[in-house]
Amino acid sequence: MEGSVNQSKWQAYSHLMRINKPIGTLLLLWPTLWALWLAGKGVPSLSILVVFVVGVFLMRAAGCVVNDYADRAVDGHVKRTAARPMPSGRVSEKEAKVLFVVLVLVSFGLVLTLNAMTIWLSLAALALAWAYPFMKRVTHLPQFVLGAAFGWGIPMAYAAVSESLPLSCWLLLLANICWTVAYDTLYAMVDRDDDLKIGIKSTAILFGRYDKLIVGLLQFATLLLMLWVGYLTQMSGAFYWSLLLAGALFIHQQKQIATRERDACFKAFMDNNYVGLVLFIGIALSYWQG
């Protein structure tokens, strides 16, 4: 009996950390890998790669915990989130706080194996991860904070590998912010009706009937900024082919959301994993060919 209770509790913790839903981890991982390869002009050292990959998993988990803690009073009123561990009572507020602290401490322990510049930058990463969930109550632009949070691994990667933050680093971060706002707007379009009822703010609500157009413009800006990064870092043809393929994926997403149907918007959001993968392959092949 005790074993089944413990198993149920650990399952609730894993759901709180979204271990069963890896899409967020992947969307955080791809730009981090882009930066590691660009900063290292090829494959980075194994030790740094391991720190960042594990760190991505831990900080995404921590972000999910603090997000559910912030939304604990409203998730029960939204069909998609009503069964989450906190609104369903499977995880208490105290347990969520402890889990968040543990995840952050382990993450920081990993960062301490890196240089001082990376350690200082990690403090901003923690602040962004904590701030994002609460932005949904004060601004219609929380997706921009999420973009910065999901992209902060980029300057950290440059700092860890090269101890420098060149223009390409900041352009890559800006590209990731544009991409994140685009795909998270698609995600917010799924919950728009529910969010309006409970007072949650999002770019999907702010953009209104111009949502598809603005998402398209953000996707186009992502490609232009990545093109600039490719020019500055002297990428080979493989990278530019990956940009074309990413553009084709964005066009497909626009077709998917044409009617703004919830399931289609969610599918378009999920498909952004392939955008991140394609761009990473383009970067990796550029250095492999070189």
Swiss-Prot record:
It is a multi-pass membrane protein. GO terms for biological process: ubiquinone biosynthetic process. It is an enzyme of class 2 (transferase). Keywords: Cell inner membrane, Cell membrane, Magnesium, Membrane, Transferase, Transmembrane, Transmembrane helix, Ubiquinone biosynthesis. Gene3D superfamilies: UbiA prenyltransferase. Its main location: membrane. InterPro entries: HB_polyprenyltransferase-like, Prenyltransferase, UbiA_prenyltransferase, UbiA_sf. Its EC number is 2.5.1.39. GO terms for cellular component: plasma membrane. It is found in: Cell inner membrane. Pathway: Cofactor biosynthesis; ubiquinone biosynthesis. This is 4-hydroxybenzoate octaprenyltransferase. It comes from Serratia proteamaculans (strain 568). The lineage of its organism: Bacteria, Pseudomonadati, Pseudomonadota, Gammaproteobacteria, Enterobacterales.
